[in-house]
């Protein structure tokens, strides 16, 4: 049973004179502060003036050490507020890395998260769940095994949403434990509740009716995003859902409508199709993934159609509705078409959570999409307040968010650092997955760079045959005259893994000749680099 006590921070001021500049003697009634753990019990903070001691309840919610600052009220009561070198709003990838980087240089750090389960959107509704769903589908449906041993092989019987959800919950719990242990090990305090600015250095943390205040020398806004909602969409979290509430589906829909063909929409469309649902994907844009090399996009589109996905591109959804019995969802298109499905997944954009923080009290303002503007050092218009992660917009990747958070902490505490690299890989976890780093054919053509292409088909690689992947490919782009590597694009199994070989060569301005001249393990997918390099160099 949790033995934490609920004790407010109050210090009675014993005034000896009326000189405001006089340092007044204080008789301390309580020198601990409290906050709620998930079972509505509280956590005791280490005694005032102690070193980085720790306390945690049986549920694992953790309190580290901090300093205190006195704030005097009109009635003579001095409220002793916990004061931190850094308070991080959000415990996702950006918040985690910033908090740990600051703690490593002996700074007092606190993390505020509005949910009982730390880890942010990335762990609970975003990156980790979606990628776990993908891997669970591969395992439960036996897709890779069937490719190797034929359709007669069945790895699992009928696949249900429950089967997938069990695995997702297991991974989420493990990742949450990893984050909690990392923060605890580094002496970082964790607060549960909604963070609101009172002034540029003061935050209040509200958990239901309870609330308490924190002072911070530096603040990092890393509160992430949520699915964008249109007021015309009648969400019910069962038949019409956003991507954060797919778990609300009672079973696998026979027919699914996915509105939005961005990265998230494409990923979930491919997941549902791989499970056997007939998917219609609707987007008002004429093409998908316009930032990706279009040869890769065309190959991906072909394979998605092979999964059974129907594309309705260049079509705007004008109305979404349900029937009277709430058994079917309907999407009406501007062209007059009406699509029926057992479920509709709305995947049109994300909305930043900064619009819930009372930014105006800190002298800041969020844009209409709830995002915060920052400079190249991740500072907002108020220099001691930083922002990182999805809440600042593009590129909104878990990988880049981690580095943004770390760099923000480095700058605020004078830790030597390099600026955010311009070169980073994208991974899109559709079935099949794709990844890219560097330039595309379209950008090289528009900038009039003389380039050549080298391609390796997975069907040429022994390893891919063993894995049952006949459809993948690796594409290298390099300068015709200097042979400098310019871009790397991959489609197929482990594309998001092998892309990093190309990333390293690109970063060091390497030549495509490197792949030709190096010896790779055999059989491996990495061998595709040598095959693609030879293919491209033989075209010169």
Protein language model annotation of sequence segments:
Residues 81-84, 100-252, 280, 285-289, ...:
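Glycine-rich flavin
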Residues 87-89, 195, 213-224, 259, ...:
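Short hydrophobic core segments
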Residues 236-253, 338-411, 501, 505:
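FAD-site-proximal beta/loop scaffold in flavoenzymes
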Residues 95, 265-266:
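N-terminal Rossmann-fold NAD(P) dinucleotide-binding loop
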Residues 89-94, 98, 103-115, 121, ...:
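Flexible, glycine-rich terminal cap/loop adjacent to redox cofactors
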Residues 7, 13, 38, 42, ...:
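Short linear motifs in low-complexity or flexible loops
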Residues 81-92, 252-262:
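Beta1/beta-strand and adjacent pyrophosphate-binding region of the FAD-binding site
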């Amino acid at each position: 049973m949790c033995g934490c006590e609920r004790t407010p921070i109050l210090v009675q001021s014993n005034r000896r004179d009326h000189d405001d500049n006089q340092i007044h003697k204080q008789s301390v009634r309580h020198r601990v502060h409290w906050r709620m753990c998930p079972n509505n019990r509280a956590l005791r903070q280490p005694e005032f003036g102690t070193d980085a001691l720790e306390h945690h309840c049986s549920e694992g919610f953790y309190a580290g050490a901090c300093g205190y600052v006195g704030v005097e009220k009109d009635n003579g009561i001095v409220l002793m507020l916990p004061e931190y070198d850094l308070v991080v709003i959000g415990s996702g990838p950006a918040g985690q890395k910033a908090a740990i980087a600051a703690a490593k240089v002996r700074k007092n750090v606190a993390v505020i998260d509005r949910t009982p389960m730390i880890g942010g959107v990335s762990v609970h509704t975003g990156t980790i769940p979606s990628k776990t769903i993908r891997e669970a589908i591969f395992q439960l449906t036996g897709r890779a095994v069937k490719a190797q041993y034929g359709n007669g092989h069945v790895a699992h019987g009928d696949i249900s949403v429950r089967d997938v959800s069990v695995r997702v919950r297991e991974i989420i719990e493990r990742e949450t434990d990893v984050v909690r242990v990392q923060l605890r090990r580094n002496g970082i305090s964790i607060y549960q509740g909604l963070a609101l600015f009172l002034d540029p250095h003061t935050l209040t943390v509200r958990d239901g009716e309870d609330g308490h205040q924190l002072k911070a020398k530096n603040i990092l806004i890393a509160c992430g995003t949520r699915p964008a909602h249109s007021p015309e969409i009648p969400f019910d979290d069962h038949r019409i859902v956003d991507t954060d509430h797919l778990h609300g589906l009672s079973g696998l829909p026979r027919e699914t409508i996915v509105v939005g063909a961005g990265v998230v929409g494409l990923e979930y469309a491919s997941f549902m199709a791989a499970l056997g649902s007939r998917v219609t994907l609707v987007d008002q844009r004429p093409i998908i993934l316009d930032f990706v090399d279009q040869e890769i996009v065309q190959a991906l589109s072909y394979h998605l159609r092979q999964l059974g996905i129907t594309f309705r591109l260049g079509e705007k959804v004008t109305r979404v509705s349900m029937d009277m019995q709430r058994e079917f969802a309907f999407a009406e298109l501007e062209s007059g078409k009406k699509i029926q499905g057992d479920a509709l997944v709305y995947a049109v954009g994300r909305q930043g959570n900064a619009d819930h923080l009372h930014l105006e009290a800190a002298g800041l303002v969020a844009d209409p999409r709830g995002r915060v503007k920052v400079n190249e050092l991740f500072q907002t218009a108020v220099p001691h307040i930083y922002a990182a992660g999805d809440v600042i917009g593009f590129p909104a990747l878990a990988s880049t968010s981690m580095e943004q958070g770390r760099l923000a902490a480095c700058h605020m505490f004078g830790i030597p650092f390099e600026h955010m690299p311009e070169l980073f890989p994208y991974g899109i976890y559709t079935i099949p997955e794709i990844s890219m780093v560097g330039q595309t054919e379209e950008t090289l053509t528009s900038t009039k760079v003389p380039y050549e292409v080298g391609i390796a088909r997975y069907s040429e690689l022994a390893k891919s045959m063993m894995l049952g992947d006949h459809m993948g490919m690796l594409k290298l782009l390099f300068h015709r005259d200097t042979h400098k590597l310019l871009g790397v694009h991959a489609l197929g199994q482990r594309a998001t893994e092998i892309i990093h070989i190309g990333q390293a060569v690109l970063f060091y301005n390497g030549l495509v000749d490197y792949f030709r001249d190096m010896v790779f393990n055999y059989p491996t997918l990495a061998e595709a680099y040598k095959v693609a390099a030879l293919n491209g160099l033989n075209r010169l």
